């Protein structure tokens, strides 16, 4: 049968050609003789090799059909060349040492990740629960923010509202992805945190029907509901869901919503415009996401 594809490859031919070149007297090789020795019918394949070797300054043309390996030419064994060769070898050794160090560091990191992910004791410390957060900020209103890297956060100086209370704002701006905000609320040490997204879904602001099961949480300045399961997996991957008071979809207390909506500072704002209103499309560099919408309560 014919020769294999590997035997005809240019890479294998180059290896054989360089071997001939290194064995040639004074490093001078006749290309016609090389083509006959290597049984190459198409001489252009030989020229393809010599063009590359000449381009990287390993050979030079002596005549039309002969080339010379520069490693054996005059001046190739000067002190300058030898010193340069030693420097290059030292650089290679240094790079190989650094590569081994990086490989070792990589193995340590992989083992550390494995210890955290698979060890039963360490596993419970790989996430933060709603209970953990609430215990650190007892009595405060908690907003958990999940935003992509590079998100800009701005907290303007609080302004006094019409009722004499300060109005606080947080402006978040991201150019690389969506920003998700969760309101986490806990009434007392005995109660469990309740969580829902900000702004709340439409069904949270709807009065609950008589057929739905509802639980009225204690009145406070903040109300909350368990985040639906799909939102927990998609929107709050960094926050472990904790069991909370079971509240079916759309069953948050109407009294709590009415109380919040009637207050001077309603903490949850629906930014989607009504069919009759349009968005404000232009933003200056000093404006945040709140300025994109005509939200009067934030513009006092």
UniProtKB/Swiss-Prot annotation:
Residues 191-250 are annotated as: Disordered. The keyword Transcription regulation applies. Residues 74-170 are annotated as: Dimerization. Residues 2-73 bind DNA. Keywords: Activator, Cilium biogenesis/degradation, DNA-binding, Nucleus, Transcription, Transcription regulation. The keyword Endoplasmic reticulum does not apply. Its main location: nucleus. Residues 31-53 are annotated as: Leucine-zipper. Residues 235-246 have a biased composition (Polar residues). Residues 242-300 are annotated as: Transactivation. It is found in: Nucleus. Signal peptide: none annotated. Transmembrane segments: none annotated. Gene3D superfamilies: 6.10.250.540, Winged helix-like DNA-binding domain superfamily/Winged helix DNA-binding domain. Belongs to the E2F/DP family. Transcriptional activator that binds to E2F sites, these sites are present in the promoter of many genes whose products are involved in cell proliferation. May mediate growth factor-initiated signal transduction. It is likely involved in the early responses of resting cells to growth factor stimulation. Specifically required for multiciliate cell differentiation: together with MCIDAS and E2F5, binds and activate genes required for centriole biogenesis. This is Transcription factor E2F5. The lineage of its organism: Eukaryota, Metazoa, Chordata, Craniata, Vertebrata.
